[in-house]
């Protein structure tokens, strides 16, 4: 069974994510965003409600819709990661190679630096032979792979899991982390972008570039 190592990312999803805690400060909260490299037309709430069953879903969608408001109001304006950027947890601690065991995952972020966006990222670790050919081997290290946590369907956080898949709680999109975060269920039309990573000389996980595709909705 996959275990989630939680970081301090309170409020990131306005309570709709299973791995958000109540600790931390506002300055630690990641921002949900869309990427201008992806073309996304603004949608209204009526269309969102219709997609999940109509007005009877209003009460259950209060938290997801609050998060989606921020998706629509923000666009990507700079690099998410770049070569040499350290991966850190919600408290700003750099991630060591030994941080996760096989089958575990955690939410990480790029270490703060001027011009670098706050970008929630899913870090997972599996046995290297568990990954399919869809996973770029040059993007992974020591069984670690990293993917954007922003769902490619409507921009919610992919924060849940089910039978080894990563699940978005808003519309139940499912992604397989051992198959390049390919879509295996729900409405998303493309995989979560993968982040190229390696281990620094000091033993910490770092990025070797930016995500290999647009972050968030659109980009098809």
Swiss-Prot record:
One of its GO terms (cellular component) is plasma membrane. Disulfide bonds join 156-170. It is a peripheral membrane protein. It comes from the Archaea. The keyword Calcium does not apply. It is found in: Cell membrane. Gene3D superfamilies: Rieske [2Fe-2S] iron-sulphur domain. Its cofactor is [2Fe-2S] cluster. One of its GO terms (biological process) is nitrate assimilation. Probable multiprotein complex; a catalytic heterodimer of an alpha and beta chain is proposed to associate with additional subunits involved in membrane attachment and electron transfer. The respiratory membrane-bound nitrate reductase enzyme complex plays a role in generation of metabolic energy by using nitrate as a terminal electron acceptor during anaerobic conditions. Proposed Rieske subunit involved in a protonmotive Q-cycle mechanism-based electron transfer electrons to the beta subunit. This is Putative respiratory nitrate reductase subunit Rieske. It comes from Haloferax mediterranei (strain ATCC 33500 / DSM 1411 / JCM 8866 / NBRC 14739 / NCIMB 2177 / R-4). The gene is narB.
């Amino acid at each position: 069974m996959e275990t989630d190592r939680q970081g301090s990312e309170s409020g990131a999803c306005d309570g709709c994510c299973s791995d958000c805690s109540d600790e931390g400060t506002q300055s630690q909260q990641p921002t949900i965003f869309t990427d201008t490299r992806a073309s996304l037309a603004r949608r209204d709430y009526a269309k969102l409600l219709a997609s999940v069953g109509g007005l009877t879903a209003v009460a259950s969608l209060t938290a997801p819709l609050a998060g989606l408001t921020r998706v629509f109001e923000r666009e990507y304006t700079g690099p998410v990661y770049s070569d040499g950027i350290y991966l850190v947890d919600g408290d700003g601690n750099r991630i060591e190679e030994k941080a996760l065991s096989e089958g575990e995952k955690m939410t990480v972020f790029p270490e703060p630096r001027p011009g670098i966006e706050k970008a929630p990222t899913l870090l997972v670790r599996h046995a290297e032979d568990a990954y399919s050919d869809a996973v770029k081997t040059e993007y992974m290290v020591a069984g670690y792979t990293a993917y954007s946590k922003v769902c490619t369907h409507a921009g919610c956080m992919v924060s849940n899991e089910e039978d080894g898949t990563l699940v978005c709680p808003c519309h139940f999109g499912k992604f397989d982390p051992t198959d390049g975060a390919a879509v295996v269920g729900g409405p998303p039309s493309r995989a979560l972008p993968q982040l190229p990573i390696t281990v620094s000389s000091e033993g910490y996980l770092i990025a070797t570039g930016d995500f290999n595709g647009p972050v968030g909705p659109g980009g098809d």
